[in-house]
């Protein structure tokens, strides 16, 4: 007899992965140019050249220096590079505030398991990345969905207040947001902080913010991504280079416990312990070393900005409604007819593959991942037109 929870997750795929798998199959059958795959957040922008040169330099080092086990929390030189060369709001970071991790799942799972106990509650702001629920439930906590403001998709702080109980241990904040592309304003985050302070006092508990920030550098125009630890001291930051450096397959990131956290040492030790318990010790050794050379490399946003422009312009002309994204590389489109899955079923006839929003906790929308080639965005518009005509 196997573990039934693991069996259930193994036998079911996320909607994102299911569509991505279907897209791969169709590319083999009819050619990549005929498939409009907007399913998965796999960056189309190449990794910076410095990544290649750094790998080549590392390969010239003695093999044991590159391929051996590292300290469980990551090599000091890489943690120090992140601490010294990244901007961390108004506070400096130290190497011993950071734990290097194996990407997103590791960063967030480590953080959750360091904070929650069985029966605790973790609030997610819907729409949200579906794997949050998986990671929360694996930590034996309850995932509590709270809808964002339906007009702006900013955090609805009064709904957050109403959802907080004596069991609330954390709120996951993802800005820029996947799947909407919303960037939470400073005023919005300050209002959230005020609610969390008031509810912590009311219930005699410590409520944490888990700030999930893989899209921090991918913003458009003059959008500002506030540094949440400057606003709320009990914040843990999760970051990884899948999006900013186009390294999703290399699984490298970090967890930051800011020095301003009043429980810093205890939380840091708990994160290190959670990494050990979950088997996430030793982020990839080679990419810890690459990180030293790349930590302050700028993100190429221009290609995503062009894709955003051609899609929003084209979909507007066709009559679609959407939320204008201020960051990340997702477009949140209202599903024609109101049923996201029904629209996606029709769109599939034209090889158009967005993701229905049901698993994001907010039915009636489509997530369009536009981190694809510019030509894919341009060529897809006829499929968007045909799908809309077919459902009307």
Predicted regions and their residues:
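PLP-dependent enzyme catalytic core of the Aspartate aminotransferase-like
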Residues: 92, 161, 296, 342-355, ...
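Conserved core of the PLP fold type I
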Residues: 63-204, 216-231, 236, 382-385
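Conserved glycine-rich beta-strand-loop-beta hairpin in the small C-terminal domain of fold type I
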Residues: 285-292, 304-316, 322-334
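N-terminal small-domain helix-loop-helix segment of the aminotransferase-like
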Residues: 2-103, 110, 287, 294-301, ...
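Short beta-strand
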Residues: 35-37, 321-326, 358-359
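Alpha-helix termini
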Residues: 25-31, 89-90, 195-206, 259-265, ...
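Conserved core segment of the aminotransferase class I/II
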Residues: 233-305, 309
